[in-house]
């Protein structure tokens, strides 16, 4: 399970201590959020689908993580934007 979470929320190379700390924080946040890995992956894909309608993103710097403090758990998405796409068609905006 931790391997899947690491894959979903991987970051650049770091020291072992920092990686262990992040893993522990991720496990704690995961437990508090009560989300299974499949749900997190589905959320990640849906977020990317929506964002990609409006902007082109740099997949190399893409990062999703769960962060937790004493009161809340947050899903943090770092999505480097290459460029903003053109105008959004009326049918997608919901204009009538």
From Swiss-Prot:
<keyword id="KW-0132">Cell division</keyword>
<protein>
    <recommendedName>
        <fullName>Cell division topological specificity factor</fullName>
    </recommendedName>
</protein>
<dbReference type="Pfam" id="PF03776">
    <property type="entry name" value="MinE"/>
</dbReference>
<dbReference type="InterPro" id="IPR005527">
    <property type="entry name" value="MinE"/>
</dbReference>
<comment type="function">
    <text>Prevents the cell division inhibition by proteins MinC and MinD at internal division sites while permitting inhibition at polar sites. This ensures cell division at the proper site by restricting the formation of a division septum at the midpoint of the long axis of the cell.</text>
</comment>
<dbReference type="GO" id="GO:0051301">
    <property type="term" value="P:cell division"/>
</dbReference>
<dbReference type="InterPro" id="IPR036707">
    <property type="entry name" value="MinE_sf"/>
</dbReference>
<keyword id="KW-0131">Cell cycle</keyword>
<comment type="similarity">
    <text>Belongs to the MinE family.</text>
</comment>
<dbReference type="GO" id="GO:0032955">
    <property type="term" value="P:regulation of division septum assembly"/>
</dbReference>
């Amino acid at each position: 399970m931790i391997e899947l979470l690491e894959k979903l929320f991987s970051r650049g190379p770091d020291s072992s201590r920092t990686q262990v700390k992040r893993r522990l924080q991720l496990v704690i946040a995961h437990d508090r959020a009560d989300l299974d890995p499949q749900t997190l992956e589905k959320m990640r894909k849906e977020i990317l689908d929506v964002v990609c309608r409006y902007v082109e993103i740099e997949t190399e710097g893409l990062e999703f993580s769960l962060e937790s403090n004493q009161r809340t758990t947050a899903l943090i998405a770092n999505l480097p934007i290459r460029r903003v796409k053109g105008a959004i068609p009326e049918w997608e905006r919901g204009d009538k």
